[in-house]
Regions:
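Catalytic cores of the polymerase beta-like nucleotidyltransferase superfamily
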Residues: 1-467
Length: 467
């Protein structure tokens, strides 16, 4: 793999003609030729792409730019799966992309990229980039968004954070990526797959391998270790021995990684439908406790909650961030609730609320959780203790069901029923009571997730991701 990292003569200016030569499969800046699979040699078909992704690829191509589908979508399509989202790389510069798509916005701080908005889907379009530097965090993005808006308002804007040499060639863009299987390009010009890093072979053999020296790549960005284990669990792949050994050597660095990005990876894991397997892999490799020091997750009940989340996601349910993160705290909270309940079943609310706050505070701070998320977890968990007995009166149900935190509380209630804190009879009586007061949507959601149905074509959530 090292040879693939050999330096290239970097040319920050990528002309359109270079793009077209690249599109024809001839590397212009490399001593090493990429491997190219022509259209009949692979099974990725245009009809597997979303209409929006096709639209963006073609508009770039017809405007004279090179345009590739890149990253996870190419990997997933070659494996016969459905991608979560479609990312595009091009030689067009952010302002040029912006001009081509009215429904777009420039984002990113040091490295600017463009989000093209469609109904329910965002296509991310990035100019080929040279630098392998760690992805940015949402905090950077927020500032950058303001800057970008100001720049657009000025004819010749000063761009203090943008350094031209962040842009690179397609080969450099492939090599700055994390794993070989994530660096394949699908070329809209001739429908070929371009592989600069040995990704096709690794995809065929089921191997997760860093691009370049694994120690260097993990030091550069420790979150990649979490990602390697996550992909292995999700795809049922093996981690290449050198990559695995480097994880073992470098895992201590994870506790210094950017917390918003770690929280983002956790939420991605929880929404993948394979949280149980990913968590197990993280736990076994000794990275979970380093990444999420303040999350209690050490009991069978916690694993049961993860299994329920997986079952829900596979059935097409959407969980909110507070219900996913709060799920980690539920088993320990239930122990606290037991401890604060006397033999007559009365709960010492003041003490329980205090202990709940003490339990959540460290994680709230170390994981950069928003006040709103913490509030919903706090209220939602506490509400479960109020639902331990069957509801007595309709207005009690309605009052609770009208609270903003109730959808989160209901998720926790269902988890609590699965781990035996709520009896099946009480569970059923709350379901009936909710239907009676016209709040059946929550219980219907559950019924739906009980039936296995094919996973819908998942569109990207319109929210920013740290990169
Ligand atoms: P998923 O199915 O989880 O979305 P993905 O491969 O699309 O998987 P993303 O997090 O969406 O993962 O990132 C898109 C692409 O960006 C990756 O495929 C990879 O090429 C590149 N990438 C993401 N994170 C990193 C990183 N930390 N270091 C280097 N490259 C990265
Ligand atoms: Mg993706």
């Amino acid at each position: 793999m090292d040879e693939h990292r050999s330096a290239t003569t970097h040319s920050p200016e990528i002309s359109d003609s270079e793009g077209m030569i690249e599109a024809m499969g001839t590397p212009v800046d490399e001593g090493l030729a990429p491997r190219i699979l022509t259209r009949p040699e692979h099974k990725l078909s245009r009809k597997d792409l979303s209409q929006e992704a096709i639209k963006v690829l073609y508009r770039l191509h017809r405007s004279g730019y090179s345009a590739y589908l890149v990253g996870g979508s190419v990997r997933d399509l070659l494996l016969g799966g459905r991608p979560k989202d479609f990312d595009i790389a091009t030689n067009a510069r952010p302002q040029e992309i912006r001009r081509l798509f009215r429904n777009s916005r420039v984002i990113g701080r040091r490295f600017r990229l463009v989000h093209v908005f469609f109904k329910g889907e965002i296509i991310e379009v990035a100019t080929f980039r040279a630098s392998p530097e760690p992805p940015e965090t949402p905090d950077d993005w927020e500032e950058a968004e303001e800057e970008a808006a100001e720049e657009e308002a000025v004819a010749d804007p000063p761009r203090p954070h943008i350094v031209e040499d962040v842009y690179g060639t397609p080969a450099e863009d492939a090599r700055r990526r994390d794993f070989t299987i994530n660096a394949l390009f699908y070329n809209i010009a001739d429908f070929s797959i371009i592989d600069h890093v040995g990704g096709i072979e690794d995809l065929e053999r089921g191997i997760i391998r860093t691009i370049g020296d694994p120690d260097e790549r993990f030091v550069e960005d420790p979150v990649r270790m979490m990602r390697a284990l996550e992909y292995a669990a999700r795809l049922g792949f093996e981690i290449d021995p050198q990559t695995a050994e480097a994880i073992d050597r470098q895992k201590a660095l994870i506790s210094e990684a950017s917390t918003p990005r770690l929280t983002y990876e956790l939420l991605e894991c929880l929404r993948s439908g394979q949280a149980t397997a990913i968590h197990k892999a993280w736990w076994k490799a000794g990275v979970f406790t380093r990444a999420y020091q303040d999350l209690p997750l050490d009991t069978d009940e916690s694993v049961r909650v993860l299994e329920m989340v997986d079952a829900g996601v596979v059935a097409g349910r959407k969980f909110s961030d507070p219900s996913l993160i709060g799920g980690f705290f539920l088993p320990r909270f239930l122990v606290l609730a037991e401890e604060e309940t006397d033999e007559k079943g009365r709960v010492n609310n003041v003490r329980l609320l205090d202990r709940l706050r003490e339990m959540l505070e460290p994680a709230a701070a170390s994981m950069h959780l928003s006040n709103q998320t913490v509030h919903l977890i706090h209220q939602g968990l506490f509400a479960v203790t109020k639902m331990r007995c069957a509801p007595e009166r309709g207005h009690q149900v309605l009052k609770l069901a009208r609270q903003g935190y109730f959808p989160v509380a209901w998720e926790f209630f269902v988890f609590a029923a699965a781990v035996g804190y709520i009896t099946p009879e009480v569970h059923q009586s709350w379901k009936r009571a909710l239907r009676k007061v016209g709040k059946q949507e929550l219980t219907d959601q559950q019924r739906e997730s009980a039936q296995e149905r094919p996973r819908p074509h998942r569109r990207r959530r319109p929210r920013r991701r740290p990169r």
